[in-house]
A protein has these predicted regions:
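N-terminal, charge-rich interaction modules
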Residues: 1-75
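Ordered hydrophobic segments in well-structured contexts
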Residues: 48-52, 85-86, 100-104, 122-125, ...
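Short, surface-exposed beta-strand/loop "edge" segments at domain boundaries and coil↔beta transitions
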Residues: 57-62, 109-112, 133
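Short, compact, well-ordered microdomains
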Residues: 96-131
Length: 139
């Protein structure tokens, strides 16, 4: 099991997760968002995950390093032929933001594997109906 700093967990819990649609969909952990549910429904998706490749284990990397990692994640998404939206996770106090993807119908087990591959502390599970859930990455 992974141990994540409690302050980081708090930041993840209160962050805003933004799906860059028109208009953008902004959701939070533990709060059901009708627009997000409708987006999944419109793609025939049963679930989604919100995942980034930025800043492994919260180690701040350069913009170029983060872009390279994010492109590798995108290559995995496209190889699996999954529908996705570009997104962004943003702290509630505005001190950090990370580019992300909302990935449709990636099963939970594979999402966990991808989170491990990109050394993420946590990621977000989005059920078709119900609130988004913060998932701590298991190492």
């Amino acid at each position: 099991m992974s141990t994540v700093d409690p302050a980081l967990l708090g930041a993840y819990q209160t962050a805003e997760y933004v799906v860059l649609d028109d208009p953008p969909i902004v959701f939070q952990i533990g709060v059901e968002h009708q627009g997000l549910s409708l987006l999944l429904l419109s793609f025939g998706a049963e679930s989604a995950c919100f995942l980034t490749a930025w800043n492994p284990r919260s180690e701040v990397l350069s913009a170029d390093e983060n872009l390279d990692r994010q492109m590798r994640l995108l290559a995995l998404i496209e190889t699996e032929r999954l529908n996705y939206f570009v997104g962004r996770g943003e702290s509630s106090d505005g001190t950090w933001a990370e580019d992300s993807y909302l990935i449709f119908d990636l099963d939970r087990k594979t999402a966990m594997q991808w989170a491990r591959t990109f050394e993420q502390n946590a990621w977000v599970w989005v059920p078709g109906v119900g609130p988004a859930e913060l998932v701590i990455t298991e190492y």
